[in-house]
Amino acid sequence: MRFRQLCIGLVILSGSLSAMTRAAPLPAPYLSITTESSAPSSMLGDGRVVGIATDKIRVVMERAGVTHDITLLPWKRAYAAALQQANGCVYSATRTPEREALFKWIGPTDEAQWVLMGRADRVWHIASLEDARGLRIGTYTGDARDSYLRSRGHVVDTSPHDMLNPPKLLQGRIDLWAASWRAGSDVLVRNGWDKQIVPVFVFNRVAVYLACNRAVPDALVKRLNAGFETIERDGTARAIERRYERRATSR
């Protein structure tokens, strides 16, 4: 009798534990996201990271139920964090052949035009990247433009941070500055350099992405990519872009 009661008790306990296990919600996935200060894609506003790519990422994460934080760092550190942390991601990353196998890719989050900026008091005759050969071009550590120009044999002067390049250009230490059109133009306007430094030649157009550590689950990457497709279709992405375009024109 006791044995039978013990067996019944074990069955009941087992069923209760099974039900509890089924009822327990799975923890929400968490991503540690890093980026650099590069307006209007990612920048500090009212104490938090905002911007075109940033706002798109936040919407997609919230809709997918993914908890996350976004931290501004110098690009080299932001990039390294995504490589080293199992739940790490970085944006806005150009999807180059050298980087392809290092990450799992989500997006695109935005697009960028790469432009050579030069001093306004010089006369420029640059209709192709080949015309810039022999000129000293300013870049910064870890940036895709740096490796792009180096791989094509251009003379590159690399700084630890992109903000050092406009002063170097004005001082005559470099001939040109390889920048993102929007981010570079924003830097010039904010610092009063937009009459002294001007766009000379657009040398590439690229899509940029949220690049995630290889340990991030494929199912999560697929869900987030679907989220980016959705915000493109339903107009959310364009609404975010227009909001920042209006801010730029209202300055």
Spell out what each predicted region is.
Residues 67-74, 139, 154-168, 199-200:
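Short beta-strand-to-loop elements that line the ligand-binding cleft
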Residues 118-137:
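Flexible hinge/capping segments at coil-to-helix
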Residues 24-102, 139, 243:
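Extracytoplasmic small-molecule ligand-binding "clamshell" domains
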Residues 35-37, 112-115, 189-225, 229, ...:
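Periplasmic-binding protein-like
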Residues 80, 93-102, 175-204:
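A ligand-binding cleft/hinge motif common to bilobed small-molecule-binding domains
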Residues 62, 71, 76-88, 104, ...:
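Short helices/loops that flank or line small-molecule/ion binding pockets
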